[in-house]
């Protein structure tokens, strides 16, 4: 488990453990497309928080008792056309949009974020990294707005460490719409350095404004490129900083 000391370094505390919690009465659907590869990770991370999560094949539709939705990472439909474009037109995404309109929490992670943008759940788009390379590394994120369901476990300005793994993670949006996002406090996370400075060097993919995650029109809808489910398990992951994002489902 990563912990803070006085100078802000997150070291390892081998004496700290977070055993699985008692399962609560919440059913979270983790939508699985052909090419998804983070669905099992998401289910395990949520289950460790005591959340009743299950993988749902996209052709089967959402269970009637769905109280939360995760669209996980991967390479849905091989990223043909562009990342997330084909999955966004899957019939299950109509149900996801309807659920989002009803206030059901919806989280898109990595490829799920790309799908969410393509499906109109959030503005903007994710395109090829500025490096033109697949980026797989831990990054620092700065919490921009702590007054949301997804960031309530953090403090505004807090720095967390969460991994990325993407080739098309560069967030792009028209300047006027970006200004609206900022004015409406819909930017959740920005890439930063270990001291919280938002710089070009700390931007792994060239995202506009170093944006790593945003809200939809409703604060119950969020997308982000980093993987909170890969920063949630103390006996497996280098960081557990992603747990706070997933706690909205518990």
Locate the predicted segments by residue:
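N-terminal beta1-alpha1 cap of cysteine-dependent amidohydrolase-like domains
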Residues: 1-109, 117-123, 127-135, 142, ...
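Short acidic/polar capping segments at secondary-structure boundaries
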Residues: 112-114, 121-122, 132-133, 145-148, ...
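Alpha/beta-hydrolase-fold enzymes
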Residues: 127-158, 164-165
């Amino acid at each position: 488990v990563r912990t803070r000391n006085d100078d802000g370094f997150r070291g390892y505390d081998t004496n700290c453990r977070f055993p699985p919690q008692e399962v609560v009465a919440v059913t979270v659907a983790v939508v699985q497309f052909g090419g998804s590869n983070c669905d099992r990770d998401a289910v395990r991370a949520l289950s460790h928080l005591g959340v009743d999560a299950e993988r749902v094949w996209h052709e089967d539709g959402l269970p009637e008792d769905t109280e939360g939705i995760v669209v996980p990472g991967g390479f849905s439909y091989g990223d043909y056309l562009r990342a997330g474009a084909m999955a966004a037109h899957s019939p299950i995404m109509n149900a996801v949009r309807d659920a989002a309109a009803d206030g059901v929490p919806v989280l898109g992670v990595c490829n799920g974020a790309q799908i969410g943008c393509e499906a109109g759940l959030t503005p903007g788009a994710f395109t090829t990294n500025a490096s033109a390379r697949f980026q797989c590394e831990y990054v620092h994120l700065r919490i921009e707005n702590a007054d949301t369901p997804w960031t309530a476990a953090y403090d505004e300005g807090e720095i967390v460490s969460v991994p990325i793994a993407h080739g098309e993670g560069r967030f792009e949006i028209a300047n006027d719409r970006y200004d609206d996002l900022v004015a409406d406090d819909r930017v959740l996370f920005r890439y930063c350095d270990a001291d919280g400075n938002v710089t070009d060097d700390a931007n792994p993919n060239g995202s506009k404004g170093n944006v790593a995650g945003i809200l939809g029109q409703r604060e119950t809808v969020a997308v982000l490129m980093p993987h909170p489910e890969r920063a949630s398990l103390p006996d497996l992951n280098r960081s557990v900083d992603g747990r706070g994002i997933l706690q909205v489902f518990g």
